[in-house]
Amino acid sequence: MEVKTFAFLQIAVLIALGLHLAPAGSNQLSGPQSSANSNEAVFCDTNCTQGTDEAWSGCRGDCFCVYVGNSTEGRCMMLSGDFDYSTPGAED
């Protein structure tokens, strides 16, 4: 009985300490993970499919196709933010 009570009190103290320390972080935006440097992924209104030639079709504009595993159907998605996915030498 004493062991269960002691274990319960230890857990209660750890939970209380965790709840107390959680909001103790800084309120300033800094570092590479801050929302000032964040990117956003948004699903477009269209779906996409993979044809027999293994090319994906159905996405328009800045949208591209995302799919799971070996599926031949996917959703169109658009990324907004500061991305630089250029291939070295592709613009030569």
Swiss-Prot record:
Compartment annotation: Secreted
Keyword entries, A-Z: Disulfide bond, Glycoprotein, Secreted, Signal
One Gene Ontology MF term: C-X-C chemokine binding
Record-annotated membrane-spanning stretches: none
Protein name from the UniProt record: Evasin P942
Taxonomic lineage from the root: Eukaryota, Metazoa, Ecdysozoa, Arthropoda, Chelicerata
GO cellular component, one term: extracellular region
Primary residence: secreted
N-terminal signal peptide: 1-26
Carbohydrate attachment residues: N47, N70
Role this protein plays: Salivary chemokine-binding protein which binds to host chemokines CXCL1, CXCL2, CXCL3, CXCL4, CXCL5, CXCL6, CXCL10, CXCL11 and CXCL13.
Disulfide bonds: C44-C63, C48-C65, C59-C76
